[in-house]
Every structure is written in C-alpha cells, then in structure tokens.
C-alpha cells in the first residue's frame, strides 16, 4: 500500500480493517488461478491446526505487493474507552465467510468477497449475560458432514453458533451456552477463569484450554478438557495441576496443589489430527512472582504438553522453567514443524518462550 496504516488508531475508532487479499486472492484485482491443491482459506487461528501461520498462495508476491489496494473495510463499531476495549482476534475464513470477534466479544460473519455483514451475534443478548468487553484471539470453526458450527469463548462461557445463521445451537450445553466453570474437578467458588484463545476442533469434540490468572488473586488452574461438539458433554479432562496419585503430583509439596492456580493454557493449542495428538503450552503457577507456598517443580506449569486428543492421556511433556517465580509463562501456541536432525527429517514441536525458541 502507498500509505501506512496506524493499527492502534484504527482499532480505537472501532474498525477492524481486513485487507481482503490476506484471506482470499479472488477478491483483489491481481488474482490469478491458484496452484493446484493450494488452500485458499484460513480456517484456524494459526491457519492450520498445527499453527504454521503460513499460506502457500502465490498470487501476492514481491513483484506486485506494492500495488495492492484496500478491497473493503468492516467497521465493528463497538470500541469504547470505558470500559477500555481492544481487539486481538485473528479473523478466520471458511467456506467463503470471514468470522471474527469484536471489541465487545461479539461475533461477525462477513462475505469474504465483499465485506458484507452476513450476521452478528451479541453475547449480552443471552440470558444472565453482563457486559462482555474483553479479549478474544479467534473463534473456532467446526465442521462434520453438513453441520457447521462456530464456537466463541466469552470469558468463562462458551457459545455455540450455527455457522450459517449465527443462531445459538440450542442442543449444545444449556441452550447453546456452556459454563466453563462447571465440570472442572475443583471448587470454583471465588476463582477467576477466562478463555481468551479459541478452542480446537477435533473429530466430534471441542478441545478447550483457558484457566485462571497468574497474579496474587485466587485463580482456577488451567485444566484442559474435551467437550462433545454437539451436546457440550465433557469427554475428558487433563489436570495441569495434578491431583494426588497422578503423574507430577509429587512436584507439589504438601497440599499446595489445592490452593494454587494458573498453569493455564491462555495462548492456544495445536493439533496433529493425523496422529490424534494435542499440544498445549502453559503459563506460570500462581502467584507467578512468589513460590514460597508451592515448593517443588510445579508440573505442569511452564510446560509444553502432548496429550492423546481422544482420551486426554499425557504422552510427554517438557517443562521450560521449574518452579517459576519470574512470570516465564509460554506466550504462544506450539507450532508443529518439520526439522532435520542427524541427517533425517523428523516431526517436531517449536515453542516460543520469553527467553527464546
């Protein structure tokens, strides 16, 4: 583009500027036929379940990128100063539709070719919902056969929407809404819980992370769960703070596991659907700057965890920081990559940390 765009100023004005070329080459004047087999869509938070964040499309390249023009702009219109709002979502595109979350955690569905608003969903219109300003990084798109659903986390709730109409899928949870503070295997009274990154779609399940904060306030642990994508029934749970008798429980001295929180998956998860493996990165145990009341290595805080996506069984883990008191939580979802090791190519997991890769 000839002119620079100040993203912060745009977002303050309540505008989500979607440069259409990023999502579909068919909506810019430079378009030409894509390479055979090339994916035209961005259906997951990280483009694909393995979080490559890479598109193989070749229509836009070094020779023509300077000629791009804005195809359309969508204004969300719900930014505010009180409460202060921000927008952190990565819009996804599936079946020619762009889905995004807004400053007030609404969901907007747009025609990818024109930017026309197809439908919107406001969580505050659902019973017992209060104002929903907050952070969300993306929605989750799930499809099996002719069924297509959008899963939208809003703080401690998850909404299940028909991807075509934006209406609540009433058979899921309680009228299309799932309370994420339930079925958590601990007393959640007075504990904070928040899901800011999208869940992961796998077979007929939705895999969910999240958790409580890492500060001094009482917070929930970051247990990882699987829910039936149609009914909302819990399928399995993995305790990121192990319960007595579980692997890693000996890394928490005494009863510290009972009162500690954090060890959350706030940055998102990745999936190898072919192998059926789920990869999660976790944050610090709470309180993240004091560990005197939680002596030990504190598994599975500050860890990359590989789970059987069908059962929740731990396959392996790697803890990047033992007994964290420096807030060295893992700030990104794991990325599944191909790497060369000892002369051969292997499947590997790359994890960004606050101290390097």
Task: List the model feature ranges, each with a label.
Residues 3, 24-47:
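C-terminal segment of N-terminal export signals and the immediately downstream linker at the start
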Residues 42-46, 84-106, 131-158, 191-216, ...:
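Repeat-blade elements of multi-bladed beta-propeller folds
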Residues 52-64, 83-87, 251-255:
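Short, polar loop/linker segments at the starts of domains and inter-domain junctions
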Residues 48, 77, 244, 284-286:
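Active-site/binding-pocket entry motifs
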Residues 67-95:
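Active-site-flanking structural segment that lines cofactor/substrate pockets
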Residues 36-77:
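Mature N-terminal segment immediately following signal peptide/propeptide cleavage
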Residues 2-18:
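N-terminal secretory signal peptides and thylakoid transit peptides that target proteins
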Residues 63-77, 107-129, 158-190, 223-259, ...:
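Extracytoplasmic/lumenal domain signature
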């Amino acid at each position: 583009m000839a002119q620079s765009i100040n993203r912060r100023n745009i977002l303050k004005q309540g505008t989500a500027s979607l440069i259409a070329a990023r999502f579909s080459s068919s909506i810019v004047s430079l378009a030409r036929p894509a390479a055979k087999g090339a994916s035209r869509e961005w259906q997951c938070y990280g483009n694909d379940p393995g979080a490559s964040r890479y598109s193989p499309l070749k229509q836009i390249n070094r020779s023509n990128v300077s000629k791009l023009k804005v195809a359309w702009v969508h204004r969300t219109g719900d930014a505010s100063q009180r409460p202060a709002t921000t927008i952190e979502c990565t819009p996804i595109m599936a079946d020619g539709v762009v889905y995004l979350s807004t400053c007030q955690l609404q969901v907007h569905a747009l025609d990818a070719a024109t930017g026309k608003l197809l439908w919107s969903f406001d969580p505050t219109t659902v019973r017992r919902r209060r104002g929903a300003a907050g952070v969300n990084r993306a929605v989750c798109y799930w499809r099996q056969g002719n069924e297509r659903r959008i899963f939208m986390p809003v703080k401690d709730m998850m909404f299940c929407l028909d991807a075509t109409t934006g209406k609540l899928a009433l058979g899921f949870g309680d009228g299309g809404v799932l309370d994420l503070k339930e079925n958590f295997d601990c007393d959640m009274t007075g504990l904070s819980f928040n899901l800011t990154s999208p869940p992961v779609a796998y077979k007929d399940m939705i895999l969910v992370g999240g958790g409580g904060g890492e500060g001094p306030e009482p917070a929930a642990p970051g247990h990882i769960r699987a829910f039936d994508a149609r009914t909302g029934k819990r399928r399995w749970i993995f305790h990121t703070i192990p319960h007595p008798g579980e692997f890693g429980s000996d890394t928490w001295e005494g009863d510290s596991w009972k009162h500690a929180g954090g060890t959350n998956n706030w940055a998102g998860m990745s999936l190898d659907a072919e192998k059926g493996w789920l990869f999660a990165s976790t944050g610090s145990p709470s309180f993240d700057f004091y560990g005197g009341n939680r002596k030990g290595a504190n598994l599975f805080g500050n860890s990359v965890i590989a789970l059987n996506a069908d059962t929740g069984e731990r396959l392996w883990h790697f803890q990047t920081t033992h007994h964290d008191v420096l807030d060295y939580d893992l700030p990104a979802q794991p990325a599944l990559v191909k790497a060369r090791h000892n002369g051969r190519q292997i499947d590997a997991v790359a994890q960004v940390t606050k101290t390097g890769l």
